[in-house]
Structures are given as structure tokens and as C-alpha cells.
């Protein structure tokens, strides 16, 4: 999908870019696959802010996505490629021959009219989902399961992909987008291909108001807060941090400090750590 640039008719448009949405084939989603989505504004069930910088934004409806890809042996045809406001990737509506309709993540180069299939016997074609044990070494995949039957959890963002590196017993070696090499159960499923809409990362928001349309509230620097609000706060004028390293609002070291738990159970599945 190409990036659309604008003439600098206003300061907000000067550096603004958008998708040209050339791949999108319809603006009317499938009603049977929509669900209501209530805004949380970053609050938990007590009304306390647990995620900062969230709130407002345009009203959305949730699109029910088939991450499990468990409709084995039944071919389906791509009916539409659609925009999804809840994720960076586009989605594809699949019409199966038994009459059922499902949304899947739209891989790169998937087009209307193409056929997709799930199951161990599926061909190695873009959009097909099958167990990792049946996918040849070197194949690019996405939407990878961590537990069989739970549904894809890894590599779902726009433009991302992973690669099958090898097979070791009941596990398969997979290199993720971050560079991390990880062992995944061979019975877990993945979808062949790279996630589409790879130009998403090149979009420039351009103005503050557009961030608000997306439900993103302003991020205030800690150095301009009071000491009660942030470890960087206080002082006369533009005071330095006054600490060994930058801190999070909760007093933890940040900017390079590793936050992963030391003895996490899944450490034994990580063959090589991700790149910085």
C-alpha cells in the first residue's frame, strides 16, 4: 500500500502522510462479524488509570478475527480486503464453501478471489494456515500460536513476519521480527506469508488532533512535573534529572533497563535473545 503525501496548505498538512487505501475493496464491514466495543480510556474496573495516554477517539466496532484458523479442509475464497480501526494490519473477509464467513489478517499479496485453506494438508501458499511441522524450513510465516488451539499470538502487526529456521524433535525454531530465535511446539499453527500493509510504519501523524482521533492523549515530560508526580520533577527552571539514570513515573530505571522477569518459565524456549 502506497503512502499519500499532501501539499503544505496548512501547518498540520505540511508533514502529514496517510495510506492511499488502494488495497481496500469495501468500506462496509460484515455485520455478523461485528461486536460492540466500549471505551475504557486506560481505566481498570476501579476507575484507576492503568495505561496512560489513552482516551477519546472515534467510535469503533470490534471485528471478530479468526486467529485460530481451525476450519480444516474447507476451502474459502477472499471476498474483500478491509480496513480495521483496531489494528495496524488490514483484514480479509473469507467466504467458505459451507456458507460460513470469517475475517483473517490480510497477508501481503493476498487478493480478492484467491483461495485459502487451513489444516495439515494445506498447500504452502499465501494465506494458508497449517501446523509448523508441515511448513518447510525457510518459509516466511505470521500469526504464530504459542499453544496448540489457542490461536495466533505472535507476529500479527502490519508488515511483520517470522521465518522457520529448523526443526528439533517436537519443536520448531522460529526467528521472530525482533531477531529473537524461539522454540515453538511443532503442532502450533502459523499462516504462510508476511502481514500486509507494510507501509504503515512510514505514516506521519502530522498534527496533534489526528492523534486524538486515534484515542491517544498527550504525553507530558516528567521534567516539567512536580516532584510529587514524577522522579524527574521539581527544581528551579530547567533542572537536570539529578539521578544516575532516567526513571519511570514509578521510580524504576528506564531507557535500556531490562524489564523482563529473571526466571520466567518461557526462558527455556528462547534460543537467542532479541536484538536491542
UniProtKB/Swiss-Prot annotation:
Coiled coil: none annotated. Pfam families: Ribosomal_L2, Ribosomal_L2_C. It comes from the Bacteria. Keywords: Ribonucleoprotein, Ribosomal protein, RNA-binding, rRNA-binding. GO terms for cellular component: large ribosomal subunit. Gene3D superfamilies: 2.30.30.30, Nucleic acid-binding proteins, Ribosomal protein L2, domain 3. Residues 219-276 are annotated as: Disordered. GO terms for molecular function: rRNA binding; structural constituent of ribosome; transferase activity. InterPro entries: NA-bd_OB-fold (IPR012340), Rib_uL2_dom2 (IPR014722), Ribosomal_uL2 (IPR002171), Ribosomal_uL2_bac/org-type (IPR005880), Ribosomal_uL2_C (IPR022669), Ribosomal_uL2_CS (IPR022671), Ribosomal_uL2_dom3 (IPR014726), Ribosomal_uL2_RNA-bd_dom (IPR022666). GO terms for biological process: cytoplasmic translation. One of the primary rRNA binding proteins. Required for association of the 30S and 50S subunits to form the 70S ribosome, for tRNA binding and peptide bond formation. It has been suggested to have peptidyltransferase activity; this is somewhat controversial. Makes several contacts with the 16S rRNA in the 70S ribosome. Part of the 50S ribosomal subunit. Forms a bridge to the 30S subunit in the 70S ribosome. Belongs to the universal ribosomal protein uL2 family. HAMAP family: Ribosomal_uL2_B (MF_01320_B). This is Large ribosomal subunit protein uL2. It comes from Bacillus cytotoxicus (strain DSM 22905 / CIP 110041 / 391-98 / NVH 391-98).
Amino acid at each position: 500500500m502506497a503512502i499519500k503525501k499532501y501539499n503544505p496548505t496548512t501547518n498540520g498538512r505540511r508533514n502529514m502522510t496517510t495510506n492511499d487505501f488502494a488495497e481496500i475493496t469495501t468500506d462496509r464491514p460484515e455485520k455478523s462479524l461485528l461486536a460492540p466495543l466500549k471505551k475504557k480510556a486506560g481505566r481498570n474496573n476501579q476507575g484507576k488509570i492503568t495505561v496512560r495516554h489513552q482516551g477519546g477517539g472515534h467510535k469503533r466496532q470490534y471485528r471478530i478475527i479468526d486467529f485460530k484458523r481451525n476450519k480444516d479442509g474447507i476451502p474459502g475464497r477472499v471476498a474483500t480486503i478491509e480496513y480495521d480501526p483496531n489494528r495496524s494490519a488490514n483484514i480479509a473477509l473469507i467466504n467458505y464453501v459451507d456458507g460460513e464467513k470469517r475475517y483473517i489478517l490480510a497477508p501481503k499479496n493476498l487478493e480478492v478471489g484467491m483461495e485459502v485453506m487451513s489444516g495439515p494438508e494445506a498447500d504452502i501458499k499465501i494465506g494458508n494456515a497449517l501446523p509448523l511441522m508441515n511448513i518447510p524450513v525457510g518459509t516466511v510465516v505470521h500469526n504464530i500460536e504459542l499453544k496448540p488451539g489457542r490461536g495466533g499470538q505472535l507476529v500479527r502487526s502490519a508488515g511483520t513476519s517470522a521465518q522457520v529456521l529448523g526443526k528439533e524433535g517436537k519443536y520448531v525454531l522460529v526467528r521472530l521480527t525482533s531477531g529473537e530465535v524461539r522454540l515453538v511446539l511443532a503442532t502450533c499453527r502459523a499462516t504462510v506469508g508476511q502481514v500486509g500493509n507494510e507501509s504503515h510504519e512510514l505514516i506521519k501523524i502530522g498534527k496533534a488532533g489526528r492523534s486524538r482521533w486515534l484515542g491517544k492523549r498527550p504525553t507530558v515530560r516528567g521534567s516539567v512535573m512536580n516532584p510529587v508526580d514524577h522522579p524527574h520533577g521539581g527544581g528551579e527552571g530547567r533542572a537536570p534529572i539529578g539521578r544516575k539514570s532516567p526513571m519511570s513515573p514509578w521510580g524504576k530505571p528506564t531507557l535500556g533497563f531490562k524489564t523482563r522477569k529473571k526466571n520466567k518459565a518461557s526462558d527455556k524456549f528462547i534460543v537467542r535473545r532479541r536484538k536491542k
